[in-house]
Every structure is written in C-alpha cells, then in structure tokens.
Amino acid sequence: METKELILKKALDMFAKSGYDSVSIRDIAKAVNIKESSIYYHYKNKQDILDS
C-alpha cells in the first residue's frame, strides 16, 4: 500500500474512533510512523484527507 493510501486509511479509522476534531496531523503521522511533512506532501490539510 502506498503512503498516501496508508495516511487516508489510518486517518479515517482515527476520525471514526476519536472524532475529527480530536485527531491532529501529528497524531496521524505518529500512527503511520512518518513525519508530518510527509502528510503535507500528499494532502493540503486534515480537511483534504477527509474530503478524499
């Protein structure tokens, strides 16, 4: 699975479990074991992930 897909899958799981407002980009990066900058390479922001 590519990084972008991993970010999306993990973020959506986290949003469902904890709520969108409770999850940060930092939380997603930590869960996927990547740097925050890698998320911003693929997505503009958290809303962009949700809209994907």
PLM feature spans:
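Append "Primarily bacterial transcriptional regulators
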Residues: 27-31, 39
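Cytosolic nucleotide-binding catalytic cores of signal-transduction proteins
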Residues: 18
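An amphipathic alpha-helix adjacent to DNA-recognition modules
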Residues: 4-9, 13, 21-22, 33, ...
